[in-house]
Amino acid sequence: MRLVLIRHAHSQSNALGVLSGRLPHVHLSEKGMKQSQLLSERLGNFPVAQLRVSPMERCFETISPWLNDVVLKNSPHFEPIIDPLLNEVDYGSWSGKKLSALSRKKEWRTVQESPSRMYFPDGEGIAQMQSRAMSVVHELAKLPDSKTAVIVSHGDVIKSIVASAIGTHLDEFQRIIIDPASVSVLDYSGIKPRVLLLNDTRAVVTDLLQAPKRSKNLLGGGAGK
């Protein structure tokens, strides 16, 4: 199974430097709306076994152009799944605050250096977030090797999934960058997950998904596509 991970496009809160978390009515910015249209073109046309989307408006707005212009035209009865397990981190009382102000809190160092130990006041822990996100991935990984699933979620959620895929401890997940409207692709068809694409904002994803399957048994770096 190949898993396409998409972070929502640039949002109104991104533009303001605000940690929106799960606050309602946070929509895409004008920049984000343009990104969502370009994303639809980049994704192109490929069969989707499942499309799972965070409940936050900005995530559905990000994928809507592709869903409406490509997926539903080919499969009119296809239904995306709004999955609360892929929701943004519950940042609790940090939600709605300026990142510049939050960076001055003593807990900020924990977020950056030991995120597995961070539990947001009146919210959830980063480790809890990873656990719920990975429960979705483990379910999708049961799909046949030939299938492709798509997740539309948030930066920290996707970073935690990528960290797990490459066997990196959660405390190191801040080393991973996931930009708005970026696409990452993981392959779960082998013994261990593999990263095919990471934080990409330019590639034509269809070309990657339609490329010949890579060998499950690699030694010496493999022969490429």
Task: Name these PLM-found stretches.
Residues R2-H8, I151:
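Short, hydrophobic/glycine-enriched beta-strand segments
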Residues H154:
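Short basic (Lys/Arg) and small-residue
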Residues P65, S160, S164:
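Active-site signature of alpha/beta-hydrolase-fold catalytic machinery across serine-
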Residues Q37-R109:
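Phosphate-coordination/substrate-recognition cap region in phosphate-metabolizing enzymes
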